[in-house]
């Protein structure tokens, strides 16, 4: 789990987002967002309102890193992600500002600074990210 003030190393040169990647998103007027790529261009995404299960292209998404129910927020689906965009969510689904909210929405891949690959601060949490 990443926390506010954590310091990260990014892979950014020639980076193309992939499902499950933890990415840093430039927001220009605000602090960057650090979220996980859930769906990409061409994918169909649905969140079951009763079970809170995330369905990607009709299949339940395996998310061992999520420990809270995925609440809907402003999300109304199913949606098909347009090419050149990604849908991102935080791992703390009950308290994450992410693509489920109209305020954030879909992320243009051009706004992704890179993939977070390694945490260098705080010292007691140094290590690779999954």
Regions found by a protein language model. Give the residues of each.
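Soluble "head" domains of membrane/secretory-pathway proteins
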Residues: 4-130
């Amino acid at each position: 789990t990443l926390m506010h003030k954590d310091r990260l190393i990014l892979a950014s040169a020639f980076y193309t987002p992939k499902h499950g990647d933890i990415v840093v998103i430039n927001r220009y007027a605000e602090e960057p967002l650090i979220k996980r790529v859930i769906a990409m261009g061409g994918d169909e995404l649905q969140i079951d309102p009763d079970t809170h299960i995330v369905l990607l292209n009709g299949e339940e998404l395996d998310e061992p890193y999520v420990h809270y129910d995925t609440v809907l927020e402003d999300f109304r689906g199913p949606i098909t992600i347009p090419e050149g965009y990604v849908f991102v969510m935080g791992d703390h689904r009950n308290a994450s500002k992410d693509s489920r909210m109209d305020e954030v929405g879909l992320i243009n891949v051009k706004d992704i600074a890179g993939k977070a690959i390694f945490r260098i601060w705080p010292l007691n949490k140094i290590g690779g990210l999954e």
